[in-house]
Amino acid sequence: MKRFFLVAIASVLFFFNTMVGSANAVELTESTRTIPLDEAGGTTTLTARQFTNGQKIFVDTCTQCHLQGKTKTNNNVSLGLADLAGAEPRRDNVLALVEFLKNPKSYDGEDDYSELHPNISRPDIYPEMRNYTEDDIFDVAGYTLIAPKLDERWGGTIYF
C-alpha cells in the first residue's frame, strides 16, 4: 500500500511538472530595453544578453550598497531616475554612468570619490571591479537604467 501511495504521488508531481512547464526569466520588450545613451538624446537598446550580464554584475557587486536601487550610505540619493537626473553632471544615461564607474564624483560633481566608491580606475582598492571589461561596465550601467522600468520600488520611490 505504501509503495502504491508513493507511486501515485510521484505520478501526480510528474504530471504537473510536464503540464505546467518551466519558469522562464521575464521577457523584456525592445521598448523596455531602450534607454538613454547620452545627454544629446541618443538611445541604445540593450540585448537580452547585455541585460542579463548587467544584472548579474549589479547583484554580485553593487547590491552590497545599492540593494533595490537604494543607497546604503546616503538614503537621500538613490539610483532612481529622478536622482540620477539631478546629479551634476547628470547620470541618467549610459555613458554618464559608465564615466561615473570609471571616475566617481560626489552627487554635486565637486569631490573625487575614487577612494570611496567602487570603480575600475582603482583596482588596488576595489578588487571586485578588477576583471570587469568596458562591455561589462556598459551592461551594468544599462541595467541600472532599465531596472526602474521593472520595479516601481526601485530607488526607494515607494514604500521607503
UniProtKB/Swiss-Prot annotation:
Q: Which GO terms describe its cellular component?
A: plasma membrane-derived thylakoid membrane; plasma membrane-derived thylakoid photosystem II
Cofactor stoichiometry and binding remark: Binds 1 heme c group covalently per subunit.
Localization, UniProt: Cellular thylakoid membrane
Q: Which GO terms describe its molecular function?
A: electron transfer activity; heme binding; iron ion binding
Listed under GO biological process in this entry are:
photosynthesis, light reaction; respiratory electron transport chain
What span is annotated as the signal peptide, if there is one?
1-25
Keywords, alphabetical: Electron transport, Heme, Iron, Membrane, Metal-binding, Photosynthesis, Photosystem II, Signal, Thylakoid, Transport
Topology versus the membrane: Peripheral membrane protein
Without the gene, what phenotype results? Answer: Cells show decreased but not abolished level of PSII and photoautotrophic growth. Wild-type growth in BG11 medium, 30 degrees Celsius 30 umol photons/m(2)/s; dramatically reduced growth in Ca(2+) or Cl(-) deleted medium. Slightly reduced growth at 30 degrees Celsius with 25 umol photons/m(2)/s, no growth in Ca(2+) or Cl(-) depleted conditions; no growth in a double psU-psbV mutant.
Predominantly, its location class is membrane
What's one Pfam family here?
A: Cytochrom_C550
What InterPro entries does the entry give? Cyt_c-like_dom, Cyt_c-like_dom_sf, Cytochrom_C550, PsbV_cyt_c550, PsbV_cyt_c550-like
Please list the residues that bind heme c. Answer: 62, 65-66, 117
Has UniProt tagged this entry with the keyword ATP-binding?
A: no
Q: Which cofactor does it need?
A: heme c
Instruction: Answer yes or no on keyword Transport.
Output: yes
Family, per entry: Belongs to the cytochrome c family. PsbV subfamily.
- Assembly: PSII is composed of 1 copy each of membrane proteins PsbA, PsbB, PsbC, PsbD, PsbE, PsbF, PsbH, PsbI, PsbJ, PsbK, PsbL, PsbM, PsbT, PsbX, PsbY, PsbZ, Psb30/Ycf12, peripheral proteins PsbO, CyanoQ (PsbQ), PsbU, PsbV and a large number of cofactors. It forms dimeric complexes. The cyanobacterial oxygen-evolving complex is composed of PsbO, CyanoQ (PsbQ), PsbV and PsbU.
Q: What does this protein do?
A: One of the extrinsic, lumenal subunits of photosystem II (PSII). PSII is a light-driven water plastoquinone oxidoreductase, using light energy to abstract electrons from H(2)O, generating a proton gradient subsequently used for ATP formation. The extrinsic proteins stabilize the structure of photosystem II oxygen-evolving complex (OEC), the ion environment of oxygen evolution and protect the OEC against heat-induced inactivation. Low-potential cytochrome c that plays a role in the OEC of PSII, required for normal function or stabilization of PSII.
Q: What is this protein called?
A: Photosystem II extrinsic protein V
Question: What is the gene name?
Answer: psbV
